[in-house]
Amino acid sequence: MAKTSARSIKPGELNLKEKLVHINRTAKVVKGGKRFGFNAIIVVGDKEGHVGYGLGKANEVQDAIAKGVEDGKKNVIKVPIVKGTIPHQIIAKYGSAKVLMKPATPGTGLIAGGAVRAVLEMAGIHDVLTKSLGSSNPHNVVKAAIKGLQSMSDAYEVGERRSKSLKEVFES
């Protein structure tokens, strides 16, 4: 698997935008009643091949979103994009959430729902077919999509791993 370390990407140098995927209200029962808290899952990306996600928890919605954005900026990965789509088909699993992603021809558009759509939009992928299988929990679906994008490798990386030129990779 071709994994780009998050340490090599400096989020301060990127023009990152954020997208809110899901807000969840939690309640803690105390002696005087219920105390509410919020958690927010946020996807950040520059729409040019960099994407990350973050989880923020706080007593107020705005604070949870701000914490999620900061967390997302710490988890940015590089995604290989070939002509506006992904280099190859992949099935990624996280928990009981499974995400299938297939490359599509230019003009197809982004065929994805909810959490996967947010991840792919922020990564800058325009043409892809996806199907979310298993759990629909947005936390696990986002993590599965990120895991799938992180494990992708383009032809250059394959050639580098095999110590072959690009021409030799396509001949074998």
Curated annotation (Swiss-Prot):
BP GO annotations: translation
Record domain S5 DRBM: where: 16-79
Organism whose genome encodes this protein: Chlorobium phaeobacteroides (strain DSM 266 / SMG 266 / 2430)
Matches recorded under Pfam families: Ribosomal_S5, Ribosomal_S5_C
InterPro entries: Ribosomal_Su5_D2-typ_SF, Ribosomal_uS5, Ribosomal_uS5_bac-type, Ribosomal_uS5_C, Ribosomal_uS5_N, Ribosomal_uS5_N_CS, Ribsml_uS5_D2-typ_fold_subgr
Record-given protein name: Small ribosomal subunit protein uS5
Secretion signal, residue range per the UniProt entry: none
GO-annotated molecular function: rRNA binding; structural constituent of ribosome
